[in-house]
């Protein structure tokens, strides 16, 4: 850049020197300053010596350098010629243009002097004629002005004589403002001539004014009159020099009492908003409550304006009244939003309140009502957002609890499916609707809403976070997993149906997978950003954390459902094993009734999970022995078939027990309790595992004789087939059933199992009896 700037500076310098040499009268003057310090090789100096320069160049340079210098000087000479030509042409064009301009100016000025002379003559002629007219009309003008003054005086005199009659007409028509204006206009004359020429007029006028003063005082203290009318009466009394300072306390007290009529009470707010909307569509809206309220507030503001002028020392009390009106407006708004209010109704009532604030602020700007209202509006808006989320949570809770979930309907019908679908719709549609209402808050054009846009977005994010956390806590309370201080909906945990717990678990999964992502999209699209002030008491919306919360809640609720169902079966088993004396048990003749009840409970679990949970991939797991060959899970049953018929019962029992324990050593390890998945098969399998584990523990607490042990053997053998059909992990079920038999044998005084033919006969008899019972039930 520096190498390019140097030639430009040299060229500009050369152009300046050319201009100076062209216009300077003496060329020596323009170059005298530079010739002092010029060297002998400066070709542009006046003291340049060509011969000396050439001698120096020949001595210092070779032929190649001389040729280059020759070419360079030829180019410079050519450039100088070109620049000089351009300079001459440009100045020549300017001279021609200036000449043309001078010619036009001369042509325009030509003839102007004659026109100016004619104009001067005409002006002198007009002036002389005007002087003549003034001289001729001077005497008549004085007479006309005298008559005009006389006429005005007569009109004033006539007005004074007509004043009593005018005042009486004003009294009849209650035009007290005109009466005061007439009387104050006539006062200067009445003061001067009231005791002489206009004595009667003055007396009659004063009598009329006394009546007017009484009427104005009556209006001033009348409760039926509007605030504005009373303020006008006070102004008129002050114009009549009536002392009103003594009335100040009563007037301000009445003004304070009028605040009650200006409040927007919660029971009237909805009607006020509806009438305000409908009044915009009608031509005559004088009778609408919104219009009436607007007129009342406007009258109140005008009264404050008048009282401020009448009583200058009462400003502080007027400020207090205006602030009280504003504060009461927002207090009633907070009461109004405690019930369910739509965003449109809330905005409607907020606009009315804000219009009142703006109107009062115009009258009393020193009261700083805008700042006070802005703080109150922040509190009200924040409460409204929180109330919206609270109402949504209540809707979801009502949807879950409005169905009377009893045992029969939950199992035989599809009530759980209906409850789940209704609650899912309530959550998804409810969140969609609430964010549509919140969008109206951001779209509102009222000034305070525009200023608080970031705050509103922050409150919505914070409210969403708190809503989902509160909803998760409520789910746990509704399920009986956690307790509540007020015992939700009057239901104790022992009366909560297990089906509701299952619905809550699946609903938590739905919220995690569907609702929270949609809410995240809504917030990102319309409510992003936010003010840090909105997050001062907690974090903003964190979808990842909420998903983890509901994922954990769904697992807790699903496990709670399994525990509830298992506990019911456990109670059944406890009654079964504590009732008889197992040491004196009789010989088994049939499968015990508790087995039917146990299977019935498992059937109910299966029907419930089919309504709520999806079906998983059904895989049955087989166990293998140490050699890898498939075996049945009950090694003890195999040994029964392989025993020799010649053995005695005692020897057979001891050998069978020994082989059972020996087979356990070679069995492959079976995982009994695995993670519960949200599938029908997983829930049923886990429930069966826990029930069998409870059965095993109850067996270990008893002591059996031979018949008692055989009864346990018969019951367990009957359970094998239906349980394997219901679960997906046959290996674990076989293992647990074997464990029950082993536990019974360990607690038996005389371990002699039933023969397989007898077992089969008793089981077949039970199956036939159950089939007959089912047929009779269907036919009936």
UniProtKB/Swiss-Prot annotation:
UniProt-listed GO biological process terms: autophagy; endocytic recycling; leaf vascular tissue pattern formation; lipid transport; protein transport; retrograde transport, endosome to Golgi; vacuolar transport; vesicle-mediated transport
N-acetylalanine PTM positions: 2
Keyword Transmembrane found: no
One Gene Ontology cellular component annotation held by this UniProt entry: recycling endosome
Compositional bias annotation for Acidic residues: 273-284
Keyword Cell membrane: no
Keywords linked to the UniProt accession: Acetylation, Endosome, Golgi apparatus, Lipid transport, Protein transport, Transport
Disrupted-gene phenotype: Leaf vascular tissue patterning defects: simpler leaf venation with distal non-meeting of the secondary veins and fewer higher order veins, a narrower leaf with prominent serrations, and reduced root and shoot growth. Normal early endocytic events, but disrupted cellular trafficking. Reduced vacuolar targeting resulting in expanded expression of PIN1 in leaf margins and altered expression pattern of PIN1 and ATHB8 in secondary veins.
Stretches with biased composition (Low complexity): 626-639
Domain of life per record: Eukaryota
Protein family: Belongs to the VPS51 family.
Its job: Acts as a component of the GARP complex that is involved in retrograde transport from early and late endosomes to the trans-Golgi network (TGN). The GARP complex is required for the maintenance of protein retrieval from endosomes to the TGN, acid hydrolase sorting, lysosome function, endosomal cholesterol traffic and autophagy. VPS51 participates in retrograde transport of acid hydrolase receptors, likely by promoting tethering and SNARE-dependent fusion of endosome-derived carriers to the TGN. Acts as a component of the EARP complex that is involved in endocytic recycling.
Assembly behavior: Component of the Golgi-associated retrograde protein (GARP) complex, composed by VPS51, VPS52, VPS53 and VPS54. Component of the endosome-associated retrograde protein (EARP) complex, composed of VPS51, VPS52, VPS53 and VPS50. Interacts with VPS52.
Protein name: Vacuolar protein sorting-associated protein 51 homolog
Source organism: Arabidopsis thaliana (Mouse-ear cress)
């Amino acid at each position: 850049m520096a190498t390019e700037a140097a030639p430009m500076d040299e060229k500009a310098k050369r152009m300046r020197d050319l201009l100076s040499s062209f216009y300077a009268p003496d060329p020596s003057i323009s170059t005298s300053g530079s010739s002092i310090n010029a060297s002998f090789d400066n070709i542009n100096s006046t003291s340049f010596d060509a011969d000396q320069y050439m001698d120096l160049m020949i001595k210092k340079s070779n032929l190649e350098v001389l040729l280059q210098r020759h070419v360079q000087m030829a180019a410079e000479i050519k450039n100088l010629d070109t620049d000089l030509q351009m300079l001459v042409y440009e100045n020549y064009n300017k001279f021609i243009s200036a000449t043309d301009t001078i010619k036009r100016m001369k042509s325009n000025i030509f003839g102007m002097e004659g026109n100016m002379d004619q104009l001067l003559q005409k002006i002198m002629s007009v002036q002389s004629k005007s002087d003549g007219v003034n001289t001729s009309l001077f005497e008549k003008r004085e007479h006309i002005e005298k008559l005009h003054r006389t006429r005005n005086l007569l009109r004033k005199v006539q007005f004074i004589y007509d004043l009593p009659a005018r005042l009486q007409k004003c009294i009849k028509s209650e035009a007290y403002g005109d009466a005061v204006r007439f009387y104050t206009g006539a006062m200067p004359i009445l003061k001067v001539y009231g005791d002489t020429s206009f004595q009667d007029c003055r007396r009659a006028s004063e009598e009329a004014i006394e009546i007017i003063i009484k009427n104005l005082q009556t209006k001033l203290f009348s409760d039926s009159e509007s605030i504005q009318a009373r303020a006008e009466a006070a102004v008129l009394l002050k114009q009549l020099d009536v002392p009103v300072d003594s009335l100040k306390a009563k007037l301000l007290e009445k003004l304070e009492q009028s605040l009650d009529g200006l409040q927007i009470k919660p029971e009237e707010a909805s009607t006020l908003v509806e009438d305000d909307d409908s009044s915009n569509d009608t031509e005559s809206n004088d009778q609408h409550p919104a219009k009436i309220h607007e007129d009342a507030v406007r009258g109140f503001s005008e009264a404050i304006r008048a009282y401020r002028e009448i009583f200058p020392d009462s400003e502080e009390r007027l400020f207090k009244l205006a602030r009280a009106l504003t504060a009461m407006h927002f207090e009633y708004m907070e009461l109004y939003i405690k019930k369910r209010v739509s965003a449109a109704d809330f905005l409607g009532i907020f606009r009315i309140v804000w219009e009142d604030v703006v109107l009062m602020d115009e009258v009393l700007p020193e009261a700083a009502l805008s700042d006070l209202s802005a703080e109150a509006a922040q509190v009200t808006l924040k409460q409204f957002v929180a109330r919206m989320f609270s109402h949504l949570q209540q809707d979801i809770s009502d949807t879950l609890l409005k169905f009377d979930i009893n045992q029969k309907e939950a199992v035989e019908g599809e009530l759980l499916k209906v409850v789940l679908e209704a609650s899912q719709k309530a959550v998804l549609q409810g969140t969609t609707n609430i964010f549509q209402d919140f969008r109206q808050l951001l779209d509102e054009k009222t000034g305070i809403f525009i200023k608080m846009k970031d705050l509103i977005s922050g409150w919505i994010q914070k409210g969403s976070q708190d809503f989902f956390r509160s909803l998760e806590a409520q789910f746990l309370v509704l399920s009986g997993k956690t307790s509540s201080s007020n015992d939700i909906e009057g239901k104790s945990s022992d009366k909560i149906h297990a089906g509701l717990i299952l619905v809550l678990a699946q609903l938590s999964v739905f919220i995690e997978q569907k609702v929270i992502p949609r809410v995240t999209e809504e917030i990102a699209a319309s409510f992003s950003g936010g003010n840090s002030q909105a997050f001062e008491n907690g974090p903003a919306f964190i979808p990842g954390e909420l998903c983890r919360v509901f994922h954990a809640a769904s697992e807790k609720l699903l496990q709670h459902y399994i525990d509830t169902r298992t506990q019911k079966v456990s109670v059944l088993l406890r009654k079964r094993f504590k009732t008889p004396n197992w040491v004196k048990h009789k010989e088994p003749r049939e499968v015990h009734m508790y087995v039917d009840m146990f299977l019935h409970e498992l059937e109910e679990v299966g029907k419930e999970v089919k309504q709520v949970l999806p079906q998983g991939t059904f895989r049955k797991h087989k166990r293998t022995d140490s050699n890898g060959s498939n075996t049945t899970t009950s090694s003890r049953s195999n040994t029964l078939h392989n025993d020799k018929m010649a053995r005695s019962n005692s020897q057979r029992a001891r050998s069978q027990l020994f082989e059972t324990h020996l087979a356990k050593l070679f069995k492959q390890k079976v995982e009994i309790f695995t993670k519960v998945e949200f599938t029908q098969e997983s829930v049923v399998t886990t429930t069966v595992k826990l029930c069998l584990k409870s059965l095993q523990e109850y067996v270990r607490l008893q002591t059996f004789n031979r018949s008692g042990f055989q009864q346990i053997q018969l019951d367990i053998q009957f359970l094998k087939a239906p349980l394997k059909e219901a679960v997906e992990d046959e290996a674990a079920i076989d293992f647990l059933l074997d464990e029950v038999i082993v536990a019974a044998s360990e607690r038996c005084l005389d371990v002699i199992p039933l023969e397989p033919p007898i077992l089969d006969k008793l089981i077949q008899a039970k199956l036939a009896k159950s089939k007959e019972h089912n047929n009779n039930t269907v036919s009936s």
